[in-house]
């Protein structure tokens, strides 16, 4: 499927400089041309986020994907399970 050319959307007489001054609404058309000429050209810059999740994604899951997130998950489960076991063990001794 070939991309549709964008030039066919804009008729050549609309942006013609000689045609701009010929119509009585040329001031309005001049403002429109001025507005569109000030718009940025090219692709939009990539947004950078400074959150922990964006940093983690860039470091471990982006272009440099590795197995480190699996190790982090295993470590987090071990820490959580140890903390919960310790809490319930102390709670059991307080009740008896």
Curated annotation (Swiss-Prot):
Gene Ontology biological process: proton motive force-driven ATP synthesis; proton motive force-driven mitochondrial ATP synthesis; proton transmembrane transport
Keywords: ATP synthesis, CF(0), Hydrogen ion transport, Ion transport, Membrane, Mitochondrion, Mitochondrion inner membrane, Transit peptide, Transport
GO CC annotation: matrix side of mitochondrial inner membrane; mitochondrion; proton-transporting ATP synthase complex
Location(s) in or outside the cell: Mitochondrion; Mitochondrion inner membrane
Chief site of localization: mitochondrion
Keyword Ion transport: yes
Matches recorded under Pfam families: F1F0-ATPsyn_F
Function in brief: Mitochondrial membrane ATP synthase (F(1)F(0) ATP synthase or Complex V) produces ATP from ADP in the presence of a proton gradient across the membrane which is generated by electron transport complexes of the respiratory chain. F-type ATPases consist of two structural domains, F(1) - containing the extramembraneous catalytic core and F(0) - containing the membrane proton channel, linked together by a central stalk and a peripheral stalk. During catalysis, ATP synthesis in the catalytic domain of F(1) is coupled via a rotary mechanism of the central stalk subunits to proton translocation.
PANTHER family tied to this protein: ATP SYNTHASE SUBUNIT F, MITOCHONDRIAL
Family to which this protein belongs: Belongs to the ATPase F chain family.
Protein name (database record): ATP synthase subunit f, mitochondrial
Lineage: Eukaryota, Fungi, Dikarya, Ascomycota, Taphrinomycotina
Protein encoded by which gene: atp17
């Amino acid at each position: 499927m070939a991309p549709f050319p964008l030039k066919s959307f804009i008729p050549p007489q609309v942006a013609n400089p000689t045609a701009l001054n010929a119509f009585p609404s040329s001031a309005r058309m001049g403002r429109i041309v001025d507005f569109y000429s000030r718009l940025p050209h090219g692709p939009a810059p990539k947004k950078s986020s400074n959150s922990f999740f964006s940093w983690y994604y860039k470091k471990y899951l982006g272009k440099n994907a590795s197995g480190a997130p699996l190790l982090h998950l295993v470590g987090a489960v071990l820490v959580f399970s140890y903390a919960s076991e310790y809490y319930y063990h102390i709670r059991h001794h307080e009740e008896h």
